[in-house]
Amino acid sequence: MTSSCSLSRPQHLFFFFFLFVPFLSLGQQISVDINSAIWEFPSNPLCLSQQSNFAKSSQFSKNLDSLVSSIPSLKSNTYNFYSLSVGSISDQERVEAIGICNRVVNRVDCLNCIAQAAVNLTTMYCPQHRGAYVRATKCMFRYSDKPIFGKLETSPVLEAPNPSNATGDRNEFIRLQSELLNRLRSMAASGGSKRKYAQGTDPGSPPYTTFFGAVQCTPDLSEKDCNDCLSYGFSNATKGRVGIRWFCPSCNFQIESDLRFFLLDSEYEPDPKPGNDKVKIIIATVCSVIGFAIIAVFLYFFMTRNRRTAKQRHEGKDLEELMIKDAQLLQLDFDTIRLATNDFSRDNQLGEGGFGAVYKGVLDYGEEIAVKRLSMKSGQGDNEFINEVSLVAKLQHRNLVRLLGFCLQGEERILIYEFFKNTSLDHYIFDSNRRMILDWETRYRIISGVARGLLYLHEDSRFKIVHRDMKASNVLLDDAMNPKIADFGMAKLFDTDQTSQTRFTSKVAGTYGYMAPEYAMSGEFSVKTDVFSFGVLVLEIIKGKKNNWSPEEDSSLFLLSYVWKSWREGEVLNIVDPSLVETIGVSDEIMKCIHIGLLCVQENAESRPTMASVVVMLNANSFTLPRPSQPAFYSGDGESLSRDKNQINHIASLNDVTITEFDAR
């Protein structure tokens, strides 16, 4: 502690006494005090008018009282969903009830909220009604004398739209919001019988950069009923507002344009393990006494070392707290991820790189995820982990993959991404059969999307970033084959006004074949490093071959040299994938992309265009392109290329392998 916060010795004794006294309560059952919790409830009763009243002396009244009074003693669960009943199924006086909380509410608060909602509903809002429904800010409770488990109910409706109308293109605003909600609807509906919930973000419509959405159904519903309920809500809710919350008994949703009004998903604490309460109390008491004695004996040493330990705590700030505070991401425990990936089964493995393996996972409520488990042997686990969490979580663009969450437990470093069943571009473009799926329209869309994503990283995001590992395997494809740039483990952050400048590193990491010569040889990197990698990728997409490919007639030429030689000799057909030539020939658009690719892979970094120029060139119908100079590592007779290759053959083989730290020459 600093001098301004120091305590005298008597104060220390009282401080530590009161610090340890609370441990006496360890192991005791958590009591639910419905009077101490403060929740916001609607002032108007939501009694179901079609259901008649009951007499206070009736069996239904007794059953309802029994049900309500039992809620505080329920064992809380991590799913925040409770279904209760009193009375036999054939009994006309049977009461059925459902309580559910928002996903962001912790389980103890959830039970508090439902308990108070039940009391308010039966004593204040709808006394003696045989059916009623109430929605608080964090929970919902409903009961009925009719069967309600697994039954879709869309009435009554509560709607809370933001009073502000959207500005900009209203139709585009509504369309993009609908796309996000419909995507989340499918995810939530496919959840299990314990949770039907999904949340996510999508790029917004200017001037709104991001849309934040969350949808939820009571998990007793079938997949069809959940879909129908949310579809009904989407159709009937007020359109064109900057934010809205919509509720009915069976489902609810929220969509916002401002993160300040959107609660991110929280992680739940595990259920307490069963044990002997008396033993726990005895152990806690003994520990408290021993702890108090130790503190009293060594108080002097604590006080003298106080300033130093405070500094150490500050410098060694817990990485987990840093990730949660800075990134505001969903954090999952290791056991949840191990279950989702079938204990990291090889059948679930999607790929493997220099930093670890990627697995497909399915969470217990049905959401598919991609799990990147960083290798503890890579030597860069923490560095890559911090890079991806701190950078990617704050980036929002339709052509960048979204980081959903993370796990930090012991030595485990795990990143959780949105899952794409189409996997990555390299699975298509380098496969002779799958490549046929990629017509020119799709390939051009991929080229343009990657260009826009890199432009966002270099110039348009709040953080200016050089990716440093742009390649086909780091371009994921969504259901519509739109590209998403992935893997930011080696990305570097620049100051806003420094993206045009050059930096140096003594530890070069990346994939040979995509590396710019100045980066591979001397560790020099800038935005032009990514431009070079993009140019290689463009030529791979057009030719349908890896950058280490050689023609049968001349094994000394690799892709860049072959393209340059064919371009200079006017043999453009040699540069284009035969499947494209058969369908559309060599169009002006293909010629333009070849030209842009060659401009990007020029040996001189200053001659390469910026990504802003690339995007302009791709979108322009008539644009005079500058003449490209020869690409890096080119030699017509192959000698220069061989010499350059031998000079850096310690980096990696010509295979598409990401390599980690090595000293640049």
From Swiss-Prot:
Keyword Iron attached: no
Keywords carried by this UniProt record: ATP-binding, Glycoprotein, Kinase, Membrane, Nucleotide-binding, Phosphoprotein, Receptor, Repeat, Serine/threonine-protein kinase, Signal, Transferase, Transmembrane, Transmembrane helix
Start and end residues of each Protein kinase domain: 344-624
Modified residues (Phosphotyrosine): 417, 519
Phosphoserine: residues carrying this PTM: 473
Glycosylation sites: 120, 165, 236
Active site, renumbered: 469 (proton acceptor)
TM region positions: 281-301
Main location: membrane
GO cellular component, as recorded: membrane
SMART domains, per database record: S_TKc
Gene3D superfamilies, A to Z: Gnk2 domain, C-X8-C-X2-C motif, Phosphorylase Kinase, domain 1, Transferase(Phosphotransferase) domain 1
Organism superkingdom: Eukaryota
Catalytic activity, reaction form: L-seryl-[protein] + ATP = O-phospho-L-seryl-[protein] + ADP + H(+); L-threonyl-[protein] + ATP = O-phospho-L-threonyl-[protein] + ADP + H(+)
Top enzyme class: transferase
Family: Belongs to the protein kinase superfamily. Ser/Thr protein kinase family. CRK subfamily.
Protein name, as recorded: Cysteine-rich receptor-like protein kinase 41
